[in-house]
Amino acid sequence: MQDIKTYLSTAPVLAALSLGFLAGLLIEINRFFPDALIFPFF
């Protein structure tokens, strides 16, 4: 179990998880607000 925690805390794994989360977030934003170069929320 300690080896799994050590593996999951390495930089490539954390980078892949954070980039995957960011990509999913951008995909969902573009799904609800298509072609939005600026976000007129004001």
Swiss-Prot record:
Give a GO biological-process term: photosynthesis
Q: Which Gene3D superfamilies match?
A: Single helix bin
Q: How does it sit in the membrane?
A: Single-pass membrane protein
Q: Which SUPFAM superfamilies match?
A: Subunit IX of photosystem I reaction centre, PsaJ (SSF81544)
Q: Which domain of life is it from?
A: Eukaryota
Chief place of localization: plastid
Q: Show the InterPro entries listed in the entry.
A: PSI_PsaJ, PSI_PsaJ_sf
- Key word Cell inner membrane present: no
- Asked whether the UniProt record includes Transmembrane helix among its keywords, one would answer yes
Q: Which residues cross the membrane?
A: 7-27
What GO CC annotations are associated with the protein?
A: chloroplast thylakoid membrane; photosystem I
What subcellular compartments does it reside in? Plastid, Chloroplast thylakoid membrane
Cite the entry's keywords alphabetically.
Answer: Chloroplast, Membrane, Photosynthesis, Photosystem I, Plastid, Thylakoid, Transmembrane, Transmembrane helix
Free-text function comment from the UniProt entry: May help in the organization of the PsaE and PsaF subunits.
Q: Which family does it belong to?
A: Belongs to the PsaJ family.
Q: Which PANTHER family match?
A: PHOTOSYSTEM I REACTION CENTER SUBUNIT IX, PTHR36082
Designated name of the protein: Photosystem I reaction center subunit IX
Species in which this protein is naturally found: Cryptomeria japonica (Japanese cedar)
